[in-house]
Structure formats: structure tokens, C-alpha cells
Amino acid sequence: GAMAERTKLWVYFAFGAVFTLIYSITSHWIWHSGGWLFGRGMQDINVDIRNTPVGVEINRGYGDWLWGKDVRFENVSRAALIVSNENNVYTQVGMENASARNVPTFVRFRDSGKTLAGKGRDYLVKEFNYGLFIRQMGEPGQFSTNYKTAALPASAAPTRALRALPASNDWANVLEYGAKGDGSTDDTAALQKAIDSKRTVYLPLGFYVVNDTIRMKPDTVLIALHPGLTQLVIPNGSPQYQGIGSPKALLESARGGDGIVSGLGLATGEVNNRAVALLWRAGEQSLVDDVRIQGGHGTRLYDGSRADPYKKDAKFDTTAHWDRQYPSVWVTDGGGGTFSGIWSPSGYAQAGFYVTNTTTPGKVYELSAEHHIRAEIVLDKVQNWEFLAPQTEEEVRDGADAVSVEIRNSKNILFANYHGYRVTRSYKPMPAAILVTNSSDIRFRNVHVNGESGFASCDDAGCATYLRASKFAYENAIRDVTNKLDVREREFAVFDYSGAQRKAPAPLGKVAKLEGGFYSIAGGVVDAQGKLYFVDRHWKRIFSWTKDQGLVVVRDAPLDPVNLAIDNSGNLMVLSSYGPQASVYAFDPRKPGLDMTMIQPTPVAGRNGGRIAVPVNFWQNGEFKDQLNPDTYEFTTLAEMFARDVALPKANQYVSPDGSLALPAYRVLRQGAEDHLGWRWADSLQTHGFVTAPVGGRVVFTNGSENRTFSGVVGAGGGITDLKLVANRGGEGAAVAPNGDVYVANGQVFIYGKDGKQKGRIDVPERPLQLLFGGANKRTLFILTHHALYATQIN
């Protein structure tokens, strides 16, 4: 059932013996003759891998998020793990408590040829981690390896990650106790009677209306086979769930029991303020597996239609009831156990997964908590819990102000293969994915905080796909609320939060805050005299700034400006998101009035001379197409795809009024309405700004999908060729100083010399997004962040 709704699996695989393999799929993976060959996210729990040259192999040229616990390797001749793409933030690999028997090499690094040898014939890998390590908050990470082994203890029978369900001949069918499941009959009494009478109760497909709490016995097992088509449903306005009062559960476990709930959907409606979908106080051996909280996106109704959480009509506004119920899944009062495959996307609830007041161990496998108004996952006064491959998703409307995870008054917590995602349609900045307050001993392994996803569409220009990279991913991965510290890196393999750090290291460099209070600024450009122009897109304002004049509003017409460029005559070219393929207009910012010139795209062929404006940051589209070479069983790498695609010239371009500047007409995909209410996606719109060079000249730009900075030769139509690596960092943007040093915005501002080595860093109070050299002598580095404009002087 969950697989039908989400791209997730939890399956049983045989490697000589059958044990549980739990993994998340976000891209490609295959079984090759030498072992698992995969890309983009995998988690192994309690897995046997035997009699094979390679255990798990990460594709050539790809980073990955690989996490394993209690994995057993036996007779693996070449390497248990082959790690690719070293010294890249997207390579995050970790193993805990992995046993190795006759495995001479535990890790082989493909690119460097380095190896981590086994310790004798049989050994235990207590810890292995590779990737970016965060040593303390307020500092960038460094690439490192952690490898700790020990003697292998005597063999013991492995413990299943997920308990087995009782045999089907022990199941009692709830229909035999009078339940109807017809979406209208009150089945409360029949459900409770079945539970009181039998240990294992089976619910056939149906919608079972409930008007009071269904209470489990300590050993109750509730089994359904599809959480979308088998639901317990509280009807709107159910009397016992109304008004202000203490939480009242739809389904409630017994305290300290070892009950099981499997394959069931729980629907608390929209207008039931006191509702909790699942109130869990059961013990460490209990299990909640494949449970879907209904009420959010994708909710099935009894008549086969889908609920719309955005629906508004003359009689009812669903959005008025967001964040009006208690948490959907609430584990409290000593509750614990194993939670696997929970999908909790109901924005009517306070949070998707809420754990309070417990030291009972808990293990959470592949939780997806989404679409809540304030927080997706909350821990308060919690100890001894593990979250393995949790995902959160914050929507543009119901999640614009939401944090992914809140951890309060807690300790001894593990988050591994964590994914904090804000949808690409987001338009509002948010400071941090994870908030930590008054806590300690929180271990983070393999953290991925992002805001990009693929989109496919057809329009008058044909069909196309595009990887939309949002400008509004969380600015920081983690914020220590107590000590006012941040982890600015959004991709890393290891960070141990102790709670003991009280202040950040002294900042490097010196920056001055010139202006503040913006919604989100970017799209800047500097004219020949060094004056800065930039856009606050949300408020549709174009500003200028100079030392003498300060901040000036240049234009504030409602024309949806996004990015600016400037020609040799001082005319501003404005790329607007308005129009089916976006629009470009120009005006002279030195002249008063509202005169402007609309610029239509014209063919590139036949035009010589002038500068070409190209994006300062790109994101490579690695989705949708089959990248596997069946002869070599290798995938086209992101680097190969990027070099191929960025070299393609555009057929048309927008030429400035004086002919000195051309903006290639990048393909624009529309999502939503054709007017200003729809979204537009294009490299030229998703970038934080433009860089320019004449045909045959070099530009410096970043590839966010590799997190690297390159230089390349610009051709007619904006194709960029002859790529050369400039820096092994590359986030939101880059700029070249008068002396040739390259400044890269990637959490902080990193300075690289002509030899490609880092030679300095400038720490900025907020995440830098765009860098521009300006001022009278072009030695003022302007640093644009979402909410403020900073500057520093470069000697």
C-alpha cells in the first residue's frame, strides 16, 4: 500500500539466508554480477551479503547516501564497499556494527585507489564513515574517514529488524464481529469487540467509521493490507473530538505492551480538534509498520475520489483547519518500539511524528512526515531513539513556515540518512531545517538538506524535462537555539552534537552590513562605475546601492523582475518570470520615468561581438532519461551530463538596446497557470545572477549538483565548453576578483587562488547567495543574502 503511494520499499532479500533489507530509492540501483550497484540513497539494516566479489558499489562519478547497520559480509573477495566520487559533499557513507568474515578489504576507494584493509580474517567494523565531517558548529566541514574495528564476537542469531506477523490462520476477521467498513456505519463497537475477543484482528479493505477511541490490548495485533484502502475514519464533527480538551486518540495502544499495527490508514478528518490518529505507549518490542495518516495530499475517500487539502468553496474552507489537531502519531509516556514505513502528511495535525517523555528505545525506519504548518518531527524529553532514513517535505503553502525537525530536552538520539526537503515551488526563506534546544548527544550521519526535483511538461515548444533547483532550501542544516549556533553545511556525513559548545569560532574576514530587512534579494549586477543593482523578487523592487547614495528604489512596477544584466551603455536588462517563456525588457536606470523597451528573442546566427550573459549557477538534470550503458553497466555521470548539456547553444537570444550584450533564450517550462500565478522554470530564472564574457572568453560559474566551481569558454548562444575545475566547492555563486582569485558562495565565502587551492575564507552572518565585485575601484565585494546586503573590502 505504501509502495503504491510513495517510491519506497521494504522487502525481504535472500543472500543464502533471508533477512530484512530496508532501503530508500531516489534514483537508480541494480544488481550486477559483482554486487549491489546503485546511486542516490540506500539503507541496509540486518542484511547478509555473501559469496560475491563486491558487497555494495557506488556508481562511477556519483556520490551517494549509504547507511548500514548490523550488515553481515561473508566471502566478499574484492571489497565490501566501493566508494566513488571522493572529496565530494554528496558522498556520504556509513556503517555501524558490520561483521566481516573472509573480507580482506572492507573499503576500496575507486578514484584514489586507497583501501581500508580488514583486521584479520574475521572482524567487526564498529564504525565506518566517509564524507564531510563537521567538527564544531560555526565552521565548515572537512573531508575525513573514520574506521574502527574490533574482534568479531561469537556468532549469535541475528535479530529481525521487523517482527513477523502472526500466521494468517490466526487472524480474526473484523467483519465477523459486525463491522461493515462501508464508510457510513458506525463500526466503533464492532471493532472494539473484535479486539477485546481476539489477539490478532484482520481488517479487510474498507472505510471503518469510528466515533470513540479504539483501544488495543497489550498484545493486540491489527492487520490490514492497504493503508490507502483500509482506513479507520473519524467523521467531521464527531462529538467526542470537538472543542478544547485533552488529546483523544482514534487508535490507542496499551501501556508497555508489544502490540502490532500493520498496513492500516488512520483518518482524523478536518474538524476534530482533539484528535490524535495514533497514541502509542507500547514498549520496546512493539511494532507499527506501513501506516498511512490520511487527511493530507493523496487521501482516498470512500467513493474513490481524492481529498483536496486546499479546497475552498462557499460552504467549507479546508485551509482554515490546518494545524488544528494534536499530532498525528504521538509516542509518549514511556512508549517506544519499531516504526517502519510511516507516511504522515496531514496538515490538519500539529505535527507528523511527535515523541515526548520517554526513555524507552525507539527505532524509526523510513518515516515520511510532510505538509505540516510548524514542524514535521518533534522530540521533547526523549532518549535512546534512532531515526534511519527519515524524510520531511515542506510544501509551498502548508509548509512555508515549517521546520523539518525540532529536538528539545533530549539526548542519545541518532539521525542517519536524513533528508530535509523543501519543495522547489517554495518562495519563502527559512533559516534552518533542524532546531535543537537544551539537548545533548545527538548524532547526525548522512545529512541531505535540499530543494530540487524534476519536472516534465509539454507546451507549444514541445515536451521537455527540467531539474528545478529552488532558491529556498533551508539556509542552515542545524540551528542550536540555546547557544545561537548554526551548521551552515547542508550536505555532510558526520556531526556529533554535544550541546557543550557555547560559542562559534571567531569569524574570518570582516564584513559590514550595508542594508537589511529584505524578503529575498538576488539577481544583482554592477555597472561600469561600480554601482550595484539588485532585485527583491517578492516585493517586485529593483534597488541600487552606492556608498554616497545608499539604498535607492530604482523601479517597483509589478513586472516580476528576477535577474538583471547591464549593457555597455548602462541600460539594465531585466529578466522577468512573466509570460509563457518569461520576458525581457530594458530601461535606463539613470533616467526618471517608467519608459522601458520590450526585447523580443531573435536568432543567434549572424550576430558577432558583444558579451554573452549566462547563469552563475546551474543544476544538472540527471532524472527521467535512461543513463545506463548495458554494455558496461555504467551510468553516464553527472559530470559528463553537465559538460554535455551546458555546451549546447541556444537558438535565440535577447539583445540589449545598444547591441553590446545578449542573454540566451533558455528553455522555460511552465507549471500552473499561464499568468503570473504559475511557476516558470529555466536555468536563467533559477540562477542567483548572471556572469558575462565575450564569445571566446571565460566565465566562472558553479554546478550545484556536483558542488563544484568551473570556468569555461562562452560561445555564441551561451554554450559553455572547455570546462576546467576551479574549486572543489560550488554552491550558489562565484565571482572573480581583480587579481584573479575566485570567491565562491557555499555556506560562507571561500577564496581560491589560481592553483585551485583554498587561500582564505570570509564568514558572513547569513548564507551568501550572490557575490559581485563593485565600488569605485571594483575592490568592494558585495555579498547578497536573502535578507541583507553585506560588503567587504578586498586588498
Where do the model's predicted regions map?
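Beta-propeller domains
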Residues: G63, R324-P327, D333-E376, K381-N384
